[in-house]
C-alpha cells in the first residue's frame, strides 16, 4: 500500500511538473533554485538569503508538487505587498491552515475576499477603537505588577522568557475578555503553548508539502486535533459568557465589541455575513499572534543587552535623564517615543535582527502579476523572507552586528518589516510596540540585567521547522537599581 502510494505520488508530481512547464512556457518566470530539500536547512531564512548571490532577490523553489516564489529584499517585498497589494493579498489554503482554523473564518490564514476585508475591519476596529482608551493604562498596570514580581525574585536567576509569556498573555486576556484572573490566564497560556508546539511539529508541516501523507497514521496530527478541541472549548465558553452578560451599545472589551459589531450592516455588498465563528477565530488570532511573539521579542532584547552591557548602561542613563534617577514616579512618555530615542532604536534593532516570524506566512497571488520584470502567475505561492531582507548588506551596513545607533540618524536606516506590510500587516503591531516600549523601559529603569553564573545566553535561534524564531532557554539575574516607580493608580 505504501509503495503504491509513493509511486502514485511520484507520477502525480511528474505530471504536474510537465503540465506547469507547458502552461507557463511563454512566461518570463523567476529563476529556479536547484534541488528540492530546501526545508531541511537548519537556518532556512539565512540559507534563502544566500541563494540571492546566484539567483537574485526573486527566485523559485520547488517544494513538493508546487513552485514557491521567495522575495528576499525590502524592495521586492514592498513592491508586492504595498504597491501591488491586491495581487498578492491571497492566502494559500494548505491542509494545516484548514485544520487549525474554522472553515474559511480565520483572519490570519483566510484567503482574500470581501468577507475577509469586513472581518479585518471589525477586528482592527476592536483593537484601535473599542479598547483605545484602556490599552495604554492596562499595559502600564500589568507591567508594574510584573516588575513587582521580578523584585521579589531579585538576586536569583529568573527564567525571563516564561515571565514575559505570562505577562503578554495577561495583556491579551484583559483586552479580549476584560479578565486577568490567574486561572484564565494560565489556561490560555498553556493552550497557546500546546497548540503552537503541536502545529509547528514536522509531522504537521510536512502535510503542506506532501498532502497525500494525511491519509497515513500520524500521532502528531492527533495531538494537534486534541489541542484544537481544547482551544475551541475555552474560547466558546468565553463567548457564551459574554453573550449572556453584555449590554447592547456598550462594550467592556474586544469580544463585546466584535460580537455586537458582526451584525451591523456593511458598506460592501455581496460579501456575505460575519458570523460568531469569525469572532471566535479573531480571538484565537489575538492569542496566537499576541502572546509568544511579543514575549519572544522581549526575550531577544534581554539576551542582546546581556551581550552588550554598554548599550544597557546607555539606556539606563537615558531613562534616568527622562524619568529621574533610579526609579521615580514619572510615567514613561509613551505618546512621544522620541524622548527615549536609544530605547526606540534598540527595539528597532532587535526587531531587525530577530523578527519573530522570519518567513512571513505564505501569500497567494489573486491574479497575474509581476515583480522586477518576472511574471508571477495567478495562484502562485509567495513567501516574503523578512529576516533575509533585514540582513541584506546592500541596504544595511554590517547587517549581522547589533548596532542600535544605526537607527539614531533620521533617514539613515529604513523601517524594519518585522510586522509585515500591506494588506496582511500584523493588526496587533500598535499593541506589540506599546508592550515592547513600556516593558523594556520599566524593566531597565528598575533593574540592571546581569547574567547568572555560566555562559551568556546563545544568540543563535533554535533550529526547527516552526513559524516563530525562538531562542534557547536562558536565565537572567535582576539587580534592583532603587525603589520601583509607583503604579499608574498613584498618579491621579
Curated annotation (Swiss-Prot):
Question: What is the catalytic activity of this protein?
Answer: 17alpha-hydroxyprogesterone + reduced [NADPH--hemoprotein reductase] + O2 = 11-deoxycortisol + oxidized [NADPH--hemoprotein reductase] + H2O + H(+); progesterone + reduced [NADPH--hemoprotein reductase] + O2 = 21-hydroxyprogesterone + oxidized [NADPH--hemoprotein reductase] + H2O + H(+)
Q: Does the keyword Oxidoreductase apply?
A: yes
Name any GO cellular component annotation: endoplasmic reticulum membrane
For this chain, one GO molecular function annotation is: heme binding
Q: Which residues bind heme b?
A: 91, 120, 363, 424, 426
The first-level EC class reads oxidoreductase
Q: Which UniProt keywords apply?
A: Endoplasmic reticulum, Heme, Iron, Lipid-binding, Membrane, Metal-binding, Microsome, Monooxygenase, Oxidoreductase, Steroid-binding, Steroidogenesis
Residues reported in the UniProt entry to bind progesterone? 231
Q: Which GO terms describe its biological process?
A: hormone biosynthetic process; progesterone metabolic process; steroid biosynthetic process; steroid metabolic process
EC annotation? 1.14.14.16
Q: List the disulfide bonds.
A: none
Q: Note one Pfam family from the annotation.
A: p450
Record's comment describing the protein's domains: The leucine-rich hydrophobic amino acid N-terminal region probably helps to anchor the protein to the microsomal membrane.
Regarding protein family, the annotation reads: Belongs to the cytochrome P450 family.
What name is this protein filed under? Steroid 21-hydroxylase
Q: What is the lineage of its organism?
A: Eukaryota, Metazoa, Chordata, Craniata, Vertebrata
Amino acid at each position: 500500500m505504501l509503495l503504491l502510494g509513493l509511486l502514485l505520488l511520484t507520477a502525480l508530481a511528474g505530471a504536474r511538473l510537465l503540465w506547469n512547464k507547458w502552461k507557463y512556457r511563454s512566461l518570463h518566470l523567476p529563476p529556479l533554485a536547484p534541488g528540492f530539500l530546501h526545508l531541511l536547512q537548519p537556518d532556512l531564512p539565512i540559507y534563502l538569503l544566500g541563494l540571492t548571490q546566484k539567483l537574485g532577490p526573486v527566485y523559485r523553489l520547488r517544494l513538493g508538487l508546487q513552485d514557491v516564489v521567495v522575495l528576499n529584499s525590502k524592495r521586492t517585498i514592498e513592491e508586492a505587498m504595498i504597491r501591488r497589494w491586491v495581487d498578492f493579498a491571497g492566502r494559500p489554503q494548505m491542509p494545516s491552515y484548514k485544520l487549525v482554523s474554522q472553515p474559511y473564518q480565520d483572519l490570519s490564514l483566510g484567503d482574500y475576499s470581501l468577507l475577509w476585508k469586513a472581518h479585518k475591519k471589525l477586528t482592527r476596529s476592536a483593537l484601535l477603537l473599542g479598547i483605545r482608551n484602556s490599552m495604554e493604562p492596562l499595559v502600564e498596570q500589568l507591567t508594574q505588577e510584573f516588575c513587582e514580581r521580578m523584585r521579589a525574585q531579585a538576586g536569583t536567576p529568573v527564567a525571563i522568557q516564561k515571565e514575559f509569556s505570562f505577562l503578554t498573555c495577561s495583556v491579551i486576556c484583559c483586552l479580549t475578555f476584560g479578565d486577568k484572573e490567574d486561572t484564565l490566564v494560565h489556561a490560555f497560556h498553556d493552550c497557546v503553548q500546546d497548540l503552537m508546539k503541536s502545529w509547528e511539529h514536522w509531522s504537521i508541516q510536512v502535510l503542506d508539502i506532501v498532502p497525500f501523507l494525511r491519509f497515513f497514521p500520524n500521532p502528531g496530527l492527533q495531538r494537534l486535533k486534541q489541542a484544537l478541541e481544547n482551544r475551541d472549548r475555552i474560547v466558546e465558553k468565553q463567548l457564551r459568557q459574554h453573550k449572556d452578560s453584555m449590554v447592547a451599545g456598550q462594550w467592556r472589551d474586544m469580544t463585546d465589541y466584535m460580537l455586537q459589531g458582526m451584525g451591523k450592516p456593511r458598506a460592501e455588498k455581496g460579501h456575505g455575513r460575519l458570523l460568531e465563528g469569525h469572532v471566535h477565530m479573531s480571538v484565537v488570532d489575538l492569542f496566537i499572534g499576541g502572546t509568544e511573539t511579543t514575549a519572544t521579542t522581549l526575550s531577544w532584547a534581554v539576551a542582546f543587552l546581556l551581550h552588550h552591557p554598554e548599550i544597557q548602561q546607555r539606556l539606563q542613563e537615558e531613562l534616568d535623564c527622562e524619568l529621574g534617577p533610579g526609579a521615580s514616579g514619572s510615567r514613561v512618555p509613551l505618546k512621544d517615543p522620541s524622548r527615549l530615542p536609544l530605547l526606540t532604536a534598540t527595539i528597532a534593532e532587535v526587531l531587525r535582527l530577530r523578527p519573530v516570524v522570519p518567513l512571513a506566512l505564505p501569500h497567494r497571488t489573486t491574479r497575474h502579476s509581476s515583480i522586477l520584470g518576472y511574471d508571477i502567475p495567478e495562484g502562485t505561492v509567495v513567501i516574503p523572507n523578512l529576516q533575509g531582507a533585514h540582513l541584506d548588506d546592500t541596504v544595511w551596513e554590517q547587517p549581522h552586528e547589533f548596532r542600535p545607533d544605526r537607527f539614531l540618524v533620521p533617514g539613515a536606516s529604513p523601517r524594519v518589516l518585522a510586522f509585515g506590510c500591506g494588506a496582511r500587516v500584523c493588526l496587533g503591531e500598535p499593541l506589540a510596540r506599546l508592550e515592547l516600549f513600556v516593558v523594556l523601559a520599566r524593566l531597565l529603569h528598575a533593574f540592571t540585567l546581569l547574567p547568572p553564573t555560566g555562559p551568556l545566553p546563545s544568540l543563535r535561534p533554535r533550529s526547527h521547522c516552526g513559524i516563530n524564531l525562538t531562542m534557547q532557554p536562558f536565565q537572567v539575574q535582576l539587580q534592583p537599581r532603587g525603589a520601583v516607580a509607583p503604579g499608574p493608580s498613584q498618579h491621579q
